[in-house]
Amino acid sequence: GLKLKEIMEDGTLTAETQPDSFDADGNVKIGYVGAFSYAEVVSGYTAFYLGVKSVVPNVVMEVKYTNSWFDIDKEGAAAEALIANGSVIIGQHADSTGAPAATQKLHDDGKICYSVGYNIDMIATAPTAALTSATNNWAVYYKHAIATVMGGGDLEQDWSAGYNDDAVGITELGESCAEGTADYVADIESKLKDGSLQVFDTSTFTVGGEEVTSAPVDLSFMDYTTDPATVVYQGETVEAIQDGHFAESTFRSAPYFTLRIDGITEDAEAVE
């Protein structure tokens, strides 16, 4: 979001310099490469979009799926298609370097585009296009698991941790990040940790033009390898809206945010 704001304010990105990056209503376009249309990906791309929107309110996002967790060619093709449609920032929830590499190539060719990666630092792949990556710190779980076993305890089958435990975060900031990004990020992380900022604050998004006041979630575990899907474990139904926000990964570790919020469009056909 900060990079988008910077290049819009300094005149680098305008309707004249890159007209296809703005829709008919003047909203600036960003894109996202997703593996599958599962809650895990939907939750991630919605959080990404809301983060950008908190800095640049007039933003819309297009999502393209690859139907694969790791496919360099498809992820690269998805990024190329999104950028061809005008997307300026490309996020991802897919595991390869395909999207950042494609973004860097187009960036080198003069296109105004940048990458936010997933899992690992993408600066080596996209030295001037990579801004940062979302990442997991698995050391937190390894320490927990080892200590539990050494203490004679049983490992939980349903476990999650977040910013409070330093289990998630972002990688090194790239050289193209906007001035002041490090301080801004530190402030946001502090607010996430103390609870004063909620990722899915319902006052920050709408569904069908309406604020979301209720979101029942069925916590059953399903086997999606069968057709139709079958219930493996019958769970209870809970209300996910708690104190004005969607309480993601509170009632179980596996994500369950499946709302399609306004401002985001998903392409019906996966990248071939």
Residues of each region from the PLM?
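A residue-level marker of the well-folded mature domains of exported/periplasmic proteins
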Residues: G1-E272
